[in-house]
Amino acid sequence: VDAGFGGLRDDRFTRRLRVADYLDLTDGDTTGFFRDDCDHGTRVTRNIGGFSNDTLLGLACKADYYLVKSDLEHGEPREDERRLCRALAWLAQRQVDVVNISLGYTVFDDFDGYTPQMLDGRTALCSRFLDSLLDAHPRMVVVQSAGNEGKNKWRHISFPGDVAEAVTVGAADSEGTGRSGKSGTGYYPHPVKPDLVVYDSPNGTSFSTPVVTGLCAALMGYRPMKRRELIRLLHASGTRSAAPDLETGYGIPQCDTLLGFLDTPAELQTLPLNATQ
């Protein structure tokens, strides 16, 4: 779900991806979907599964892609939040396994009713909707960007990144030991948010998030599992799994650790249950 997929069918890293279906919720245009002036979604998709003959940018290069434009590139009307809900419903109807949302909401041009104190997963419209959708679809995984408010007045993650079973992804600093300055932080101690961080390239949590989306798709392809089990694995593999915090969550997920868990079923039974609390 994004703000535009301009150039996706011409970009050397995304032109060979399998697009199963697509939808424009902003104006209903389908003929010009891939000629959009905005290419934010295309750049995000590169990090999910982009590849060329000699380069692999994302891990989900063999997935089927369902693309939805729900957000306006310029301005922040509250209708963007409503369209996100409709986009998620459309994807759920198509039984999409893993959803990437490199969008997030805090304040709007025409609505100022949200505050950081409302980051409880139960208050914002899109958070309530996503929470109920995930409850109805235990195998659906939604990977949500933490947002780039870390240096702004808001400071914290954006909605719907506060939903307990959304995999909320922030951005790590260049050393991989802390939070990139503008990456949003968690507000409440439980559940820990963001869940994970990844180095962002290009800059911003919009581009760290799809790295984790590609990882989730690859893991689900390797061994299908329910969402809670996947989240528990991701948390347990993180570089800060022993001491998660509101800056970097459970840290950077480690692929070698994840594969070790998957290849040794006994280890799965000993992972801490509080990893998803």
What feature does the model see in each segment?
Residues 208-223:
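Short, small-residue alpha-helix embedded
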Residues 100, 221-277:
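C-terminal subdomain of the subtilisin-like protease fold in secreted/lumenal serine endopeptidases
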Residues 28-36, 199-207:
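Short pre-catalytic strand/loop immediately N-terminal to key active-site residues, enriched for Gly-Thr
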Residues 172:
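Carbohydrate-associated surface elements
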